[in-house]
Amino acid sequence: MSPSFKHNCTNDHYVVEWASKQAAKADYIVTHYGDRFDIKFLQSRLLYHGLDPLPLPKCLDTWKMSRSTLKLHSNRLASIAAFIGAGNKTPLSGPIWIRAMSGHVPSINYVVKHCEQDVLVLEAVYNKLRRLDGCHPNVQVFYGKPDGCPRCGSEHLESKGYRATQLYVYQKF
């Protein structure tokens, strides 16, 4: 926790600066509804604090993956996670947020634990949905495995027939 946060719990400069540095190092950022909320929120806070805005990050958005490939009653992260068995989000009520924003340490700790669980659920959802994403980057490039799965990098491939284009026939895995 930064000293400025201990003095003023509404000062998010340290968190925003840290998040910006982490995002700038990443090739891709995995989010849920990130293009429509998280990235814009972070950009707004960076400008507010007089920090440089992020270069436009490449997002792998599980909300978009779900919305474009599944037909669910809701595309909220909790709904998708429950549907595919990817863990549970912790509940977070308005009163807890309000207490946390006023500096109530137990509420702040609860929000931190909630966010950590959120990341674990997001990771599990992403790992399941990325197989459905036709625009997912080829992870073989990152793993250096030219004969691996382009979506997860696994070398344990199972042939699933062939796919034809106008010019070529490709084996499906």
Regions found by a protein language model. Give the residues of each.
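Positions that flank functional sites
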Residues: 61, 96, 164
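Short cysteine-rich clusters marking metal-coordination/redox-active sites
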Residues: 149-152, 170-173
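Short cysteine/histidine-rich zinc-coordinating motifs and their immediately flanking basic loops
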Residues: 160-167
